[in-house]
């Protein structure tokens, strides 16, 4: 049986499971040395690996929770103000859109835009949906669930984003 053994110099740390930050949503915030030379860590030592969760924890990934009583979405939108955000409910989906025009930051000028779309459970009471933005930039979208025999009231409507002065109580995974 022939087994091909590849030298660690030619391996990319975790391959497609560890994407480069170079062109992700943090474009313009500066780079880690790993972003410029991803093969360097395995060249120096085949046993050294960057933390898998370093980029995951700082990537703005949303968290969706659906328990027996309510449905909640947490989304890191620290670069956007409430005026830059639009939250709409279209039938069984919530659409979150953020856009700010070009502005100056520490690294030059930047403009950002994103679209997120989530399916709402069929038993979420759409007349009682709320959305708030915490002081640390965490958007919280929530709605109570109704008992399965009741109509949840599906329609199209905009949800206003209110600003909170305290940091979010969302877990920082």
Swiss-Prot record:
CDD domains: ACD_alphaA-crystallin_HspB4. Residues 1-63 are annotated as: Required for complex formation with BFSP1 and BFSP2. SUPFAM superfamilies: HSP20-like chaperones. Zn(2+) 3 binds at residue 154. Its main location: cytoplasm. Residues 145-173 are annotated as: Disordered. Residues 153-167 have a biased composition (Basic and acidic residues). One of its GO terms (biological process) is lens development in camera-type eye. One of its GO terms (cellular component) is cytoplasm. It is found in: Cytoplasm; Nucleus. Residues 52-162 form the sHSP domain. Glycans are attached at residue 162. Zn(2+) 1 binds at residues 100, 102. Keywords: Acetylation, Chaperone, Cytoplasm, Eye lens protein, Glycoprotein, Metal-binding, Methylation, Nucleus, Phosphoprotein, Zinc. The modification Phosphoserine is found at residues 45, 122. The keyword Phosphoprotein applies. The modification N-acetylmethionine is found at residue 1. The modification N6-acetyllysine is found at residues 70, 99. The modification Deamidated glutamine is found at residues 6, 50, 147. Acetylation at Lys-70 may increase chaperone activity. Heteromer composed of three CRYAA and one CRYAB subunits. Inter-subunit bridging via zinc ions enhances stability, which is crucial as there is no protein turn over in the lens. Can also form homodimers and homotetramers (dimers of dimers) which serve as the building blocks of homooligomers. Within homooligomers, the zinc-binding motif is created from residues of 3 different molecules. His-100 and Glu-102 from one molecule are ligands of the zinc ion, and His-107 and His-154 residues from additional molecules complete the site with tetrahedral coordination geometry. Belongs to the small heat shock protein (HSP20) family. This is Alpha-crystallin A chain. The gene is CRYAA.
């Amino acid at each position: 049986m022939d087994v091909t053994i590849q030298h660690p110099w030619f391996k990319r740390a975790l391959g497609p499971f560890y994407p480069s930050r170079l062109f992700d949503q943090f474009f313009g915030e500066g780079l880690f040395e790993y972003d410029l030379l991803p093969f360097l860590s395995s060249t120096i030592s085949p046993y050294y690996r960057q933390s898998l969760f370093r980029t995951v924890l700082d990537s703005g990934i949303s968290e969706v929770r659906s328990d027996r009583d309510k449905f909640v979405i947490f989304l890191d939108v620290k670069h956007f103000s409430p005026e830059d955000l639009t939250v709409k409910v279209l039938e069984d989906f919530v659409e979150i859109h953020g856009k700010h025009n070009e502005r100056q930051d520490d690294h030059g000028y930047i403009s950002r835009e994103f679209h997120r779309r989530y399916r709402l459970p069929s038993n979420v009471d759409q007349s009682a949906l709320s959305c708030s933005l915490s002081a640390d930039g965490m958007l919280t979208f929530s709605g109570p669930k109704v008992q399965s025999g009741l109509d949840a009231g599906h329609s199209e409507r905009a949800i206003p984003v209110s600003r909170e002065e305290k940091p979010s109580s969302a877990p920082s995974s």
